[in-house]
Amino acid sequence: MTPLSSPLSQYWQTVVERLPEGFTETSLSVQAKSVLTFSDFALDSVIAHPEWLAELESASPQADEWRHYAGWLQEALAGVCDDASLMRELRFFRRRIMVRIAWAQTLSLVDDETILQQLSHLAETLIVGARDWLYAACCREWGTPCNPQGVPQPLLILGMGKLGGGELNFSSDIDLIFAWPEHGETRGGRRELDNAQFFTRLGQRLIKALDQPTMDGFVYRVDMRLRPFGDSGPLVLSFAALEDYYQEQGRDWERYAMVKARLMGDNDDAWSRELRAMLRPFVFRRYIDFSVIQSLRNMKGMIAREVRRRGLKDNIKLGAGGIREIEFIVQVFQLIRGGREPSLQSRSLLPTLDAIAALHLLPENDVAQLRVAYLFLRRLENLLQSINDEQTQTLPADDLNRARLAWGMKAENWPQLVGELTDHMANVRRVFNELIGDDEADTPQEEERSEPWRDVWQDALQEDDSTPVLAHLADEDRRQVLTLIADFRKELDKRPIGPRGRQVLDQLMPHLLADVCSREDAAVTLSRITPLLAGIVTRTTYLELLSEFPGALKHLIMLCAASPMIASQLARYPLLLDELLDPGTLYQPTATDAYRDELRQYLLRVPEEDEEQQLEALRQFKQAQLLRIAAADIAGTLPVMKVSDHLTWLAEAMIDAVVQQAWTQMVARYGQPAHLDERQGRGFAVVGYGKLGGWELGYSSDLDLIFLHDCPMDVMTNGEREIDGRQFYLRLAQRIMHLFSTRTSSGILYEVDARLRPSGAAGMLVTSADAFADYQQHEAWTWEHQALVRARVVYGDPQLTSQFDTVRRTIMTTARDGKTLQTEVREMREKMRAHLGNKHRDRFDIKADEGGITDIEFIAQYLVLRYAHEKPKLTRWSDNVRILELLAQNGIMDEHEAQALTVAYTTLRDELHHLALQELPGHVAQTCFSKERALVQASWRKWLVAV
């Protein structure tokens, strides 16, 4: 045994002062002196339990004593009567055996491979012992879980990572996956549970028994995140659920993890054999799978970035040439060829390395260097961790611990140890680079910019590591950003994303995060983009679009940041992402007079007889145009009046196309009404009321429509299935309503409200022009005449359009008693305010409250109805702005008042548009728009209150 170096001999004096009672410097062996000087963990343990030191002095640990662990633990648990005493005994047992392993390792009484085996067997023994005790306890409480045939069901535990490979390090957490075979219920207990409930409760108690810190410490930190769906998934899964997941959604990294998976307890019962057989095809492909190279290259890139970001030159696990790279080298061959070469299917690294050599997959010299380097690094790692039973792979900076490691590694001093370490890691790095290749695709500038965000995305940051990359954000925003990323990753775990989709997503996200997180509104913007991404993660084409076209990504971020409405539209209808490719068209809406032509050309791509595709095409065209209008609105290239103009022209184009489709379908079924045989046109018109009639549509406005025809009585259609002509027009209107409202994968086209027709909902859906005229002259209420002020034909034959315009003009130019009209309009407004008024007393409803938009509309309508009999030109336009102009031009309203009302009206409408883009309700603080409101209220009093 190597004598203690000078620094350690000096430290021994400190150890002597802490020796337990009954032990002196002279009474201890050289071996004890060496171990207690090297490991503070061992020293603290024997101070608390002097009998352990006496036991070790009398009989040194043996290489094969791991075979006795299960029996020793069974004896220790014999007197356990509850969970608390179980936890105490487990912790006591673990510490006792770990001291023995530390003793053997420090003194090199056992070779390093055996040390790894002992550490792994200890963990397995404790896991299985705790499981078995708790299983029996749970069965006593709830009965034994059985399948429908009454066969008892066990809890099977997969040990992952180094635990599964029999290569556990000294201070390690343990990665586990819990499973049970078949569904069923418990039998024989005080209360029945289904098997899922039973095993979930058992799993929770097992984790607590192992993981929960007590005054005696903990047994192992338990990590369950490798299970299907991670933390968001069930704690325990049935075999069927496991099989479905790995067949449908298993990802590359889960394949890699499953290579080392081993059932704890190593039972050879039928259930264990079934689970192993089920998992094997997922891990080892029958064909030679070279796609592994790119996947591992990506993982290697992540590690390289981690090394650079955190300066991990002293990290013997993750650093260049460290333990992880040796593991990657071995896994490459396992995953590429393991399906055809059973010798490569070992869970343990060293036997697999031997198989690689035997198959001549690597030169013998490379394999030899990797073996020596691996054992060197693993010994160094375990010695480092055994000093304080601390999970670390970073070399120490203090002289004492450096002296300890140099002595433990049989180096003369620290520089010599570092030199040997450097040589080994250089050998590993060379083989690694030759095999996996260095695929740094990004430019240095892109790499530098996206590197921290790649780490954020890969969930590789520690809790406080994110501060520098998000330092410009407030604490709450920073937390929100990290939470959004974590929640999005959990959501992804639930999605059946293929390998290509995962790869593209991993390429895209660092760049997206770099752009989003550089913004002051990063949290808000990211909250709008992640639902969109969640909607397209299973559609790789869209991910590739954003990944391969940085400009499209930048436009996406800008638009989503500006408008949650746009973000919602893109999330619902990802086909719109194509619109982001060309900024020339994105921010330049179609010319107002070109929507019909654009739509007609668009529909030419779709077979006319394919109704379903026609419906989809209509909706997709509308959504694309809506996006372009909104983008131009956000960019400031469209003022509010022009936004409404574009939205109105778009709606008219859609109405035109819908009527065309409905007409074609009806005529194919019934022929057309016979009165059209001798004339052009269709004898049909669609009248737009409200915002559509007034050229004032907003982004989410519905359409107020009525339908007119000019079909005489007793006319039949001329098809093989002839029907009454008026019945034809009724069915045509019904068909139009259906085409508007049918919900396809692209949503509905528009909400349509036809209640403004004569007699409202009680009236016929379609009315003859003559009946409409008669109703307006003899039955309509004043409010219906007000509505007529804002009505116009948006689709129809010239003859019917002219007929409607005549009716409208006649009604509006009818002389009325001014006082009666004033009272009726004012009372209608008061009824509306009482029914629809603002429910938020401390807020101003821009449309409904006093001084708002509706008041301006009522003023304009009142004045048209009041004075049009004197000034027929007042009937020319149906929109409020031009009506106000006409009122000023015809001397009804002072020009200054008309202009002021126009400014107030457009200002308030502009605010409504922007609130719609933000998906916010149409009310603001009471203090807003006080000047505009006061002006409107004064005008209201002047026209509708004054005697």
UniProtKB/Swiss-Prot annotation:
Keywords: ATP-binding, Magnesium, Multifunctional enzyme, Nucleotide-binding, Nucleotidyltransferase, Transferase. Its EC number is 2.7.7.89, 2.7.7.42. It is an enzyme of class 2 (transferase). Residues 1-440 are annotated as: Adenylyl removase. One of its GO terms (molecular function) is [glutamine synthetase]-adenylyl-L-tyrosine phosphorylase activity. It comes from the Bacteria. One of its GO terms (biological process) is regulation of glutamine family amino acid metabolic process. SUPFAM superfamilies: Nucleotidyltransferase, Nucleotidyltransferase substrate binding subunit/domain. It holds the Pfam family GlnE. InterPro entries: GlnE, GlnE_rpt_dom, NT_sf, PII_UdlTrfase/GS_AdlTrfase. Residues 450-947 are annotated as: Adenylyl transferase. Belongs to the GlnE family. Involved in the regulation of glutamine synthetase GlnA, a key enzyme in the process to assimilate ammonia. When cellular nitrogen levels are high, the C-terminal adenylyl transferase (AT) inactivates GlnA by covalent transfer of an adenylyl group from ATP to specific tyrosine residue of GlnA, thus reducing its activity. Conversely, when nitrogen levels are low, the N-terminal adenylyl removase (AR) activates GlnA by removing the adenylyl group by phosphorolysis, increasing its activity. This is Bifunctional glutamine synthetase adenylyltransferase/adenylyl-removing enzyme. The lineage of its organism: Bacteria, Pseudomonadati, Pseudomonadota, Gammaproteobacteria, Enterobacterales.
